[in-house]
Amino acid sequence: MKELLLYMAKNLVDNPDAVSVNEITDEEGKVLELRVAPEDMGKVIGRQGRIAKEIRTIIKTVAQRDGEKVTVEIVD
C-alpha cells in the first residue's frame, strides 16, 4: 500500500522528492500518513477534496482485496 500511495502522490505533485509516506500500525489496522510540500498540498487534495477522496478510495479498495484495513491521512 505504501508504494502505491507514493506512486500516486509523486505523479500528482510538482516536487516529487518532497513526498513521503509514514506507515503506522495500530489495533484498527494501518494508517498511511502522506506528506507533501506545502505548495503541492492543493494538488493532492484537489477541488472540494475530490482527489484526496479518490486516493483514499483506491487505497481502501486495494487493502480490502488483500484483507487489510488501511486509512490515508494527508498531513502538513
Language model regions located:
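RNA-contacting regions in translation and RNA-metabolism proteins
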Residues: 1-43, 53-76
